[in-house]
Amino acid sequence: MKEQIRELLAHHPNGLRLREIAIYLRVHHFSLINILDEMKKEGIIDGRSNDDHANGEYYIIWYLVG
């Protein structure tokens, strides 16, 4: 699963939201939270927070490091 996420983010240099990653991989987004956290600790990916005030949403954009 980590390799699939890495390949997916390589094709999206501006990053993707958690739900977008889940849609591409066809998995439930809650199952990705631990995997993304592990990848962040390993230094493979990083996330930046984003606010959408118009829709009242707060989310993280995940992207490859380096």
Placement of each model-derived feature along the sequence:
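A local structural micro-motif
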Residues: 30, 47-48
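Pre-recognition alpha-helix immediately N-terminal to the DNA-recognition helix
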Residues: 3-8
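Short, cationic-aromatic polyanion-contact patches
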Residues: 1, 17, 48-66
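A short acidic, leucine-rich amphipathic alpha-helix
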Residues: 20-23
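Short amphipathic alpha-helical interaction segments
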Residues: 27-38
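Short helix-capping/hinge SLiMs at alpha-helix to coil transitions
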Residues: 10-13
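Glycine-centered, phosphate/nucleic-acid-interacting loop/turn motifs that mediate DNA/RNA or nucleotide
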Residues: 43
